[in-house]
Regions:
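N-terminal active-site beta-alpha-beta segment that forms phosphate/nucleotide-binding
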Residues: 31-116
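Conserved phosphate- and dinucleotide-binding cores of soluble alpha/beta proteins
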Residues: 1-33, 101-175
């Protein structure tokens, strides 16, 4: 039963995501022209994102992880190829332009938003053709650490599910 519905009076007290107030383009309420999006300036991370974007293929379902893989979405759309594949993130957005930084987990011009458990059902069932994941640490044998670096315990998130079920995985990072 619902005891009460509380409507937030001050939008600043109820952000849609860490990096924005309500944005209807991230809920599917409306679409914005792709030319209106801001693209990140050239940097080492964007260069890696540009190289990784060269692995994109038409008609594939793609998962983008947190960190450097966030740049791939923007690069794909900056180059005019973002509509040729379906970009997803584990939080649930399907299609559109997945966002990075404090907006990570959202997608502008999203086509669908799945509850996260259903997104993982799709991932676990082999629905991802190509995954781009960050690597916090890698050793000479190719072992990847994404869960604990120094005193920070980030946890593995969806890394295990995605790496074990995606048809192809591309790791993105600096050394």
């Amino acid at each position: 039963y619902v005891d009460a519905i509380v409507v937030c009076e001050n939008k600043e007290d109820h952000a849609q995501c860490q990096g924005c107030e309500y944005d209807g383009s991230m809920t599917g309420d409306f679409h914005v022209p792709l030319g209106s999006l801001e693209y990140p300036p050239m940097s080492a991370k964007k260069i890696i994102g540009r190289r990784a974007a060269m692995e994109l293929q038409p008609d594939k379902v793609v998962n983008l992880g947190i960190g450097i893989p966030e740049y791939i979405s923007m690069v794909a759309n900056e180059e005019g190829i973002g509509d040729y594949m379906t970009l997803t993130v584990e939080a649930g957005p399907v299609g559109g332009v997945p966002q990075g930084g404090p907006k990570f987990g959202g997608s502008v011009n999203v086509e669908a938003i799945l509850d996260q458990p259903y997104q993982f059902d799709f991932y676990d069932g082999g629905g991802v053709d190509l995954a781009f994941l960050g690597l916090a640490q890698a050793d000479k044998d190719g072992n990847i650490n994404v869960s604990k670096f120094g005193p920070k315990i980030a946890g593995c998130g969806g890394f295990i599910n995605i790496t074990q079920n995606a048809k192809k995985v591309v790791y993105c990072g600096t050394f």
